[in-house]
Amino acid sequence: MSLPNAFVTLLTTSSYLPGALVLLHALHDLHPAPRDFQIVALVTPETVDAATIGELRRAGYDLVIGVEPIGSGKAGQVGLELMGRPDLNFALTKLHLFRLAPFFSTLIYLDADILPLRPISHLFTSTAPHVFSACPDTGWPDCFNSGFMVIRPRESDWDGLKGMLKDGEGEDGLYREAGNGSFDGADQGLLNEWFSEDGGGGDWNRLSFTYNVTPSAAYTWAPAYKRFGHKISNVHFIGPNKPWTSLPGRPAGVSNVKGKENSYDYLSLIDRWFAVYDKHVRPASALDPDISRRFAVPQTIAAWDSHANQARAAATVLPEDKLDLSELKAATERGVNAFKPGQYTSLPLEGRVDLIMPKPKAIPRAPISQLVASSTIAPSVSPSALTPPPADAAPAPAPAPVPTQTEQKTAQPSVWDAQRSSPPASAPPEMSVPHAYYHNAWEAPLSQQSSYYAHPESHRPATEHKEPEYPTLPKEVTGDSWYARFATSTPDKRAISAVFPWEEKSYGPGYGHGSRPKPERVFPKGEEPLPSLVQQLIHPLQPPSISIQNPTPPHPAHSQHQSHATGMGMAGQAPKSPSPPPRHVSMVEAMASYKNVWDDIPQIGRYVDIMSGKTGGKSVRGVSTRGHGHGHGHIQGHGQGQKQPQAQTHERNTSLHSLQSVPGTPRTQYSTFGKSPRLTNARNLERRESFEQPEDSADGDDENSTSASEEEGGKSREGNSSKPYKGNKKYKDRWAQTDRVKTVDETVQTQTHAGEEAAAGGLKMWGLPHASAHGRKSSKEIPFPIGSGNGRAGGGGQREAQTQHQSTYYEYQQQHPHSQQSRQGSMASPKPELNVRLPDYSFDFKGATSHAQGLAQAQAQAHGQPQGQGANPNLNAQHRHRPSGSFSTIYGGRGRVWDPNTDVEVRRRDSQEVLARFMQGSLGRG
């Protein structure tokens, strides 16, 4: 019984599925039933998914055969890259066609990218008796193109092709020129080598080019295509661009050919391929969509209403792949060549049952421990002989005598591969991985943290840590003179050159030439106990000692009394009581025991307090009872360290003497330039009286601010208010200070009576003489009450000041009615409101010299004015405070009168004198 014929195609990737389906339906259209041939597809399950194989079976392929992929390998990559088609790396799988000799007599092979245009089944008989027939290639016509072939398979051809693949590798393991036996790296070069005049398969039979037309943009002969185009039987779409690559962007039934047909009709051939695809492969809904069905409302049928569906589901339906009993009997009668339509079978190589390519066999590698052992043991000794047998094992038989002539086998050196296995347990120390877990020390309680810092010899077991055994250098290295300086265990100190000049000198007892002193500084080792400060944090803290220090050395009797009162001090400490049991303390308690080293030196503490302007946390002007000279004057302990009244008075007087020596800038209340001493002394007396009133500013840093302890000793101060602390040589007049803030109102000026004073807590605004030659307004002293930071000047004091201001202001208006007129015209000025924010007053020190130059002229004009012009004889022009800014135009454009006592140089000189007195006072007390 003769074997059937078959059309065969190959599918090594799922991307060629549209081409294989179009090829199947084109053959069906060109060869209607009944057909005397089969259509077979070779697939590689390793590279093609199961869904693609299922589509081929459902589409109508008579048989789907699974085969193993044959790759070009690294040797064939050179030819594929030269051809520019690296995607053809599995093209050698086409050689499985010659293994189909037991199943088919004649094969017509077509690539999946070929479109048949005319019937070609007559080639099954017309090509006889040739074994191999093909069409010439357009690139090299002396060679055939393997995309279309007529083959009568033979087992000898399969064996010869396998031999050529193996012969491509030389004896030295390197591939010759072409690589794997194919000059292009793929199947076409290998087949042209075998089916040639010099090949083992004989010369190939040439078919007409019309059976394998390869249109491309690189090569075409338009006149020949126009003359013989109607005779084309197959169109082969070679190249990387296939017709189905434009499937996502090409709708069904659309043609790319527009207008007149081109001489190169490549687009019309593409349209013919899509015509077959749209007819058989593309879904029917895309060709003729049913709008009513697409937008119909779905209906749900109840399960109890579908009796027919239940009956159909109950019926036993055999799978398509499973044959019933009758088909199995028929298959046994017809033989193994009878297959059911759409059947799938496999054709593994070399008798294997798995089509997956086998992995390369790994060379057995000996463990590293055996390699290390083999380096010191003779090769003839077996490793198993070195392993002692178990105690209960039977005695081994005596080994056979070793022949005199033994074969010495060289073991393959093995190297550990980190990508495949973990490090061996018996590896050298440089390859061993430590398996240890370390806990965070800061997460443990304080009682356990001390164990981490203990000496290792007392707490660490001796067997816990073992130094690894490092390999030694081979004898060949140590005995070689070339490695002599590197193979010695101890380095030669003579080879070390000195870096610094003093390193050339050796240690000696003296400092003479050629010797240098031996260093006395010793650095602690790494495992030494921690410093005492760190141990205080680790171990339970003991209660801190109570100590009080005075800023100045007190009287001997007072020192003894204080030492007796405190019980414990820096000079003499009482015997300590037994410490309480250890307890866990917090970080705040641990940090409370710290103190600065310089806190024990009272001279440094007093100097810091004086330079910072504070004593015990208060202002320099205030008096504090805190006697600790370095700022830590709070008494620790329970009721200890309380001073006696006599000691407090003595310390307070000492602090007052040291604080009252702090003067300010020497400045009087009024300018004394050109004034009589009588008027100056009178105003100085008024200034003294105003300073006796306690007034504090809002920032608490006023020169008159006092503390609560100063008010307790107020009686002694009131008795000697006119001459305070005359016994102190460093004391300077307290009221010779910078004036308080004064302001001048725009319309209301201060009065001309020098003897009147403003109410307590108010600001005095000084103006200019009334009815001067330049039309200035009369001056009137207006009390302006303000509130202090501590509220002393507020409340009733402010209301009293406001009442006095109103009465004084109205009397002044009745006596001087003409002062209501404005400088610009007859517009009446409104009554000033005291709650209006006054502008800032500034003083230009750079312009003080120019103002001082016109001082003499200002005095002459003020004294030379007649009495009938309304000049004020009690106040001169140089004594008036002139505001800056927009107020300079109100007072005739004159600048502020310069006072010699407010000069910058005078203030700088006085500040230097004050600093010198402070330094002398602090050093004298220290």
Swiss-Prot record:
Compositionally biased residues, Basic and acidic residues: 456-469, 733-745
Site (Important for catalytic activity): 94
Phenotype caused by lack of the gene: Leads to the absence of alpha-1,4-glucan from the cell wall, a decrease in intracellular glycogen at 37 degrees Celsius and abolishes assembly of glycogen rosettes. Leads to a decreased fungal burden in the mouse lung following intranasal inoculation. Simultaneous knockout of GOE1 exacerbates the glycogen synthesis and virulence defect. Does not affect survival in macrophage-like cells.
Listed SUPFAM superfamilies: Nucleotide-diphospho-sugar transferases
Keywords: Cytoplasm, Glycogen biosynthesis, Glycoprotein, Manganese, Metal-binding, Transferase, Vacuole
Binding of Mn(2+), residues: 111, 113, 236
GO molecular function: glycogenin glucosyltransferase activity; metal ion binding
UniProt biased composition (Pro residues): 386-402
Requisite cofactors: Mn(2+)
Annotated stretches, region: Disordered: 379-432, 452-476, 547-584, 611-749, 768-903
Residues bearing glycans: 219
Compositional bias (Low complexity): 557-566, 813-824, 851-875
Subcellular location: Cytoplasm; Vacuole
Compositional bias segments (type: Polar residues): 404-413, 655-683, 800-812
Binding-site residues for UDP-alpha-D-glucose, renumbered to this chain: 10, 12, 16, 85, 94, 111-113, 145-146, 184, 187-188, 239, 242
Protein origin, superkingdom: Eukaryota
Gene Ontology terms describing biological process: glycogen biosynthetic process
Record's compositionally biased regions (Acidic residues): 692-704
Reaction(s) catalysed (UniProt annotation): L-tyrosyl-[glycogenin] + UDP-alpha-D-glucose = alpha-D-glucosyl-L-tyrosyl-[glycogenin] + UDP + H(+); [1,4-alpha-D-glucosyl](n)-L-tyrosyl-[glycogenin] + UDP-alpha-D-glucose = [1,4-alpha-D-glucosyl](n+1)-L-tyrosyl-[glycogenin] + UDP + H(+)
Role description: Self-glucosylating initiator of glycogen synthesis. It catalyzes the formation of a short alpha (1,4)-glucosyl chain covalently attached via a glucose 1-O-tyrosyl linkage to internal tyrosine residues and these chains act as primers for the elongation reaction catalyzed by glycogen synthase.
Family: Belongs to the glycosyltransferase 8 family. Glycogenin subfamily.
Protein name per its UniProtKB record: Glycogenin
